[in-house]
């Protein structure tokens, strides 16, 4: 089965588009996938969104972090007839929320589980887009995809991942991810 790990960055911030209700107006700046078939990354820009959507649709499973609540919603205006929310998807943030009843960040899970950190933030990614620093933007997105992939693989192999609580203590959460 081809597993596709996916993340995207946007051209705008919520404050630029009038809030979360206008998520589709954020617009894709950069997206990155990693596929188990190729064991490699692919970078997509806004003009490449049709190819990105085709790759997501061809996946046996899509893996992401907040992909259902964010990434798929950002993609909706590019493919209004596609039903991305019905793709076979493991949204790691959503899965952890169902167990914990609160949201955890990718950075918290990455630091606690892997000892890795995100290299920047979504705000920084928008700034890089606006400054034309496309290599930095795509490298940042690749790092997020790689971290997400490694968290998924860790959870598959060990049956748990970890996160840092608001008090800074490392906590373990059981996962039952199909691998």
Model segments located where?
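Acidic, Mg2+-coordinating catalytic module of metal-dependent nucleases/exonucleases
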Residues: 115-173
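Conserved RNase H-like, two-metal-ion catalytic cores of nucleic-acid enzymes
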Residues: 1-57
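A polyampholytic, Gly/Pro-enriched intrinsically disordered region
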Residues: 103-119
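Hydrophobic side chains within alpha-helical segments
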Residues: 30, 74, 94, 147-148
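Generic detection of short hydrophobic beta-strand segments and adjacent strand-loop junctions
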Residues: 43-44, 173-175
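Conserved DEDDh/DEDDy metal-dependent 3′-5′ exonuclease domain
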Residues: 36-108
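Anionic, Ser/Thr-rich low-complexity intrinsically disordered regions
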Residues: 111, 174-179
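A residue-level signal for conserved active-site and pocket-lining positions in enzyme catalytic cores
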Residues: 7, 110, 144, 148
């Amino acid at each position: 089965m081809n597993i596709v790990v996916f993340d995207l960055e946007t051209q705008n911030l919520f404050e630029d588009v009038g809030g979360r209700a206008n998520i589709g107006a954020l617009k894709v700046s950069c997206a990155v996938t990693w596929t188990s078939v190729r064991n490699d990354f692919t970078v997509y820009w806004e003009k490449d969104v049709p190819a990105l959507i085709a790759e997501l649709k061809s996946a046996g499973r899509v893996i992401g972090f907040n992909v259902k609540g964010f990434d798929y919603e950002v993609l909706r205006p590019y493919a209004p007839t596609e039903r991305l929310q019905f793709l076979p998807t493991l949204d790691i943030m959503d899965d952890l929320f169902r167990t914990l009843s609160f949201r955890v960040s990718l950075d918290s899970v990455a630091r606690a589980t892997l000892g890795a950190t995100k290299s920047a933030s979504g705000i920084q990614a928008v700034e890089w887009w606006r400054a034309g620093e496309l290599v930095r933007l795509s490298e940042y997105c690749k790092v997020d995809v790689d971290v997400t992939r490694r968290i998924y693989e860790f959870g598959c192999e060990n049956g748990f991942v970890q996160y840092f609580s608001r008090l800074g203590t490392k906590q373990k959460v059981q996962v039952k991810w199909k691998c």
